[in-house]
């Protein structure tokens, strides 16, 4: 049964990826920070950095051929929801790949739901039942039936974070290690996880 937010077309009316990136660009270029809230001021450096990350991935990424074949096998309309925010480093390192992958099949309608203004939707997809972790990808058919989920990080990246936290590493340092991992991986682990998901979900 479809969720109420799907029935109410909130997902269908959410941002396209192009709109999301344009908003991110404009937010990263604000010159007068005095007009921002305290939270927006705090997030501003991350939005700037994440816009650079997104731009680099969009410029350099080339899809894996096996994944491309699976994406092209999707033969009926799907809507892919990604819950995200511009300040989130994990979103910047994963969402551009998801967007470029989705581009290869016109039957995939990718929509970006902003977490902080849609917490009721986010709370349907908590990590471990407690954490509002993003990005979160959820795919639906045109009737709102859920097809698959992914997120908020590739499994290997999540295991790295858990290990470093358990070793007592400070947040600033383990985030640095995490983004070094993303830089080396270049989306390949995400691709492999999506390949496995699609192999199991494509009828």
Question: What would you call each of these model-derived segments?
Answer:
Residues 96-106, 128-130:
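Short, surface-exposed basic-aromatic patches at helix termini and helix-loop junctions that form
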Residues 1-77, 123-130, 142-203:
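Non-globular targeting/processing and membrane-anchoring segments
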Residues 58-61, 89-92, 115-118:
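A short linear-motif detector with a strong N-terminal bias
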Residues 69-100:
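Local sequence-structure signature of Cys/Sec-based thiol-disulfide redox active-site neighborhoods
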Residues 80-85, 98, 106-122, 140-142:
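Thiol-based oxidoreductase modules, predominantly thioredoxin-like and allied folds used
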Residues 133:
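Beta-rich catalytic cores
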């Amino acid at each position: 049964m479809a969720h109420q937010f799907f029935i109410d077309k909130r997902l269908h009316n959410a941002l396209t990826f192009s709109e999301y990136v344009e908003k991110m660009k404009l937010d990263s270029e604000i010159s007068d920070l005095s007009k921002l809230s305290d939270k927006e001021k705090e997030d501003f450096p991350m939005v700037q950095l994440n816009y650079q990350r997104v731009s680099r991935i969009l410029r350099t990424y080339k899809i894996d051929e096996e994944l491309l074949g699976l994406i092209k096998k999707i033969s009926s309309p799907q809507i892919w929801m990604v819950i995200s925010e511009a300040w989130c480093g994990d979103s910047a390192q994963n969402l551009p790949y998801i967007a470029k992958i989705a581009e290869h099949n016109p039957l995939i309608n990718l929509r970006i739901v902003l977490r902080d203004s849609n917490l009721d939707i986010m709370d349907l997809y908590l990590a471990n039942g407690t954490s509002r972790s993003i990005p979160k990808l959820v795919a639906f058919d045109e009737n709102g039936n859920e097809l698959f989920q992914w997120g908020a990080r590739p499994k290997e990246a999540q295991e790295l974070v858990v290990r470093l936290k358990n070793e007592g590493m400070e947040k600033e340092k383990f985030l640095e290690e995490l983004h070094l991992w993303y830089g080396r991986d270049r989306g390949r682990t995400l691709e492999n996880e999506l390949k496995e998901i699609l192999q199991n979900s494509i009828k």
